[in-house]
A protein has these predicted regions:
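DNA-recognition element of transcription regulators
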Residues: 14-22, 47-68
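Intrinsically disordered, charged and Pro/Gly-enriched terminal/linker segments
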Residues: 10, 26, 46-50, 74, ...
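DNA-binding alpha-helical recognition surfaces that contact promoter or target DNA
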Residues: 39, 56, 63, 210, ...
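Short amphipathic alpha-helical recognition elements used for nucleic-acid or partner binding
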Residues: 9-41, 61, 187-195
């Protein structure tokens, strides 16, 4: 988390302040009620004077954000309807910019422009400085619930972007990235299937099969299940060297991946 204004660092350092600011930013330009603050900060065990503590934290947060000023009217954090609201203008919050680039990248993919769409999705993903959001701020139930769909959306966008890049014949460039992504989630079938295909197309059949066995083991141990039929078919095709797994001969193929037709986003 970082907050800057005209080059000045206004980032709060105390955990409660950071957590409150994160909740306000995740609900930018919307009222966060006192009940929401109490639930986020203390979950199911609020102290007797939780409401008073929230008021104190807000007062301190205002001073930090406003460079030591105490007047409510001089800043963006304002009192509204038994709660507080943080005003954020267009282009100020990186999350909003990320989501805008994500939508634009997906639109390009949908329009049949895999190269431009993949590049824009890569630009969006490069905005993340860590593997997950809010790595340096405490998260309670409300922040965890708000972050979950963002994380899912990011993973789905990554799958779509890699799908486009595989269709453009960039399998060798993708191997290292896919290895890292699969390492973060050993049970993710779509990413493992993409890794298997990239490895196979790079002349690494044995490594592609090893990736399948790691997936099967992780699914059995963690989820008590097995890989789906599409991953099994891909494995069979790798063993037999099916022609449909060959890399494209042109960078202008449609956005389909015959090797794993139902594992990638449409």
């Amino acid at each position: 988390m970082s907050v800057t204004e005209n080059g000045d660092d206004r980032t709060p350092s105390a955990p409660k302040h950071r957590q409150m600011l994160a909740l306000l930013l995740m609900n930018a330009n919307q009222v966060v009620s006192m009940a929401q603050f109490v639930e986020e900060l203390w979950e199911y065990s609020p102290p007797p004077r939780a409401v008073a503590a929230v008021h104190t934290y807000v007062m301190q947060l205002r001073r930090i954000l406003h460079g030591g000023a105490t007047a409510v009217a001089c800043g963006r954090l304002v009192t509204r309807e038994q709660g507080y609201l943080l005003r954020v203008e267009d282009g100020e919050l990186d999350l909003h910019l990320y989501e805008s680039r994500l939508r634009a990248g997906r639109a390009l993919l949908d329009a049949g422009e895999p190269d431009a769409g993949a590049r824009l999705l890569r630009t969006a993903d490069a905005m993340w400085s860590g593997t997950t959001g809010l790595v340096d701020a405490p998260t309670g139930p409300l922040l965890r619930a708000a972050l979950a769909p963002i994380e899912r959306e990011r993973t789905e966008a990554t799958v779509r972007r890699i799908h486009a890049e595989l269709a453009l014949g960039r399998h060798q460039e993708l191997v290292s990235e896919l290895c890292a992504l699969v390492h973060q989630d050993l049970t993710h079938e779509e990413l493992t299937a993409q890794l298997m295909l990239a490895l196979y197309r790079s002349g690494r059949q044995a490594d592609a099969l090893a990736a399948f066995h790691r997936l099967r083991h992780a699914l059995r141990e963690d989820l008590a299940t097995t890989p789906g039929p599409d991953v099994h078919r891909l494995t069979t095709d790798i063993l037999t060297g099916h022609p449909r797994l060959e890399p494209p001969t042109t960078g202008h193929l449609p956005l389909t991946l015959d090797a794993v037709p139902t594992l990638v986003a449409a």
